[in-house]
Amino acid sequence: MNDEINEPPPNICEQCLGDEANIRMTKIPQGSECKICTLPFTLYHFKTSKRSNNIIKTLICVRCATQRNICQCCMLDSRWHIPIQLRDHLISLVNEENVMTEEAKNDMMKRFLSLKNVKLGGAQITSDPSEADNIVDKLKNILLRATSDGPSTPLIKNTTALYKNEKGANEVKNLEKYASVDISHILKKLPLNESFLKNPSTKSFFLYNIDASIPEWKITDTVSQLLGIKKWKDGNSLSLIVNHKAKCGGLRFQSSELGERFVSKISETLVTPKGLKRGVLLIDRFRIFIIPWSSGFSAASFGTNTAENIKLSLSLNKLIQLELGLSFPTKSTDNAKNDKKKTSKKVHKDRSKKSKPRANKLTI
């Protein structure tokens, strides 16, 4: 009883509450599991108006929402109403320091983190009105400078390079940095030569091309919606592992029957140049590729340290680009460009030298 009395009010933004002056809200103590920390929390659900058929409910607990300064329903920043990754990225660019929200990887650490009285990532800024206004002023100044100086200023060039070339440049740097890391023992255990519909009786699957912005709970919800049930996980082992640094993970069902049902619900597939099929799981605007994993997996299947995780993600990036018929950056890209420039200069000089006598003959 005391816990219910001392419990803070829900943290719900004005956009989710709507324009109605009076809203009837239903409170259910320990009514759901938090999508972030996985602990039970007090669930609230309501309608924005009496005529509305859409029921809005809280997805995360008050503690996790306060730590990240986000709405419990839409999970957007409470002040700016944008995704927390976009918020953190903007603040990092303006302040020239990393303020990204680091999420825990396993359930135990998620629960431990939720009990701390801290502000994570950009919540340190947007939870303070003066700090948030300061960031907005800095952003306005940057935009004003960009529009007033013209398209040839270093600011515009740097900004363009950041969005167009940052991903490729970082990948080339990582290829060089982690070139000596050996992950052959990891790759040989991955089912990369398996085909999606070849062995549908398995209950385990390998997931790759997982974007860093996709949380684990969203994959769980998508699978639950596909199957039409919530209790599909294997209670005796880890049913879902997502390693965001490696950009891959594993999915395990209670039975092979559920695995077959999952395969039948996947409508989109990809056929690689080698003739192998990949299932495609659509989440938001991203495509996660799926392969049956008959041997199963463990937490160590994706690497035991950060270096192995990143090297695995680079190897899978190459695989994805090969399967999609795309080219991928290599170490020699910049050198090849420089050699091309040097060669073109030499040819230009030779041509100019040969053309001078011809010009003199014409003028005589």
Curated annotation (Swiss-Prot):
Example GO molecular function: U6 snRNA binding
UniProt main location, coarse: nucleus
UniProt xrefs under InterPro entries: Cwc2/Slt11, Slt11_RRM, STL11/RBM22-like_N
One GO CC annotation: U2-type catalytic step 2 spliceosome
Basic residues biased stretches: 339-364
Disordered: annotated span: 331-364
Top-level taxon of the source organism: Eukaryota
UniProt keywords, alphabetically: mRNA processing, mRNA splicing, Nucleus, RNA-binding, Spliceosome
Signal peptide: none
RNA-binding among keywords: yes
Pfam families: STL11_N
Zinc found in the keyword field: no
Biological process, per Gene Ontology: mRNA splicing, via spliceosome
Subcellular location: Nucleus
Misc note: Present with 4260 molecules/cell in log phase SD medium.
Role summary: Involved in pre-mRNA splicing. Facilitates the cooperative formation of U2/U6 helix II in association with stem II in the spliceosome. Binds to RNA.
Subunit structure as annotated in this protein's UniProt entry: Belongs to the CWC complex (or CEF1-associated complex), a spliceosome subcomplex composed of the U2, U5 and U6 snRNAs and at least BUD13, BUD31, BRR2, CDC40, CEF1, CLF1, CUS1, CWC2, CWC15, CWC21, CWC22, CWC23, CWC24, CWC25, CWC27, ECM2, HSH155, IST3, ISY1, LEA1, MSL1, NTC20, PRP8, PRP9, PRP11, PRP19, PRP21, PRP22, PRP45, PRP46, SLU7, SMB1, SMD1, SMD2, SMD3, SMX2, SMX3, SNT309, SNU114, SPP2, SYF1, SYF2, RSE1 and YJU2. Interacts with SLU7.
Family membership noted in the UniProt record: Belongs to the SLT11 family.
Protein name: Pre-mRNA-splicing factor SLT11
Protein's organism: Saccharomyces cerevisiae (strain ATCC 204508 / S288c)
Gene encoding the protein: ECM2
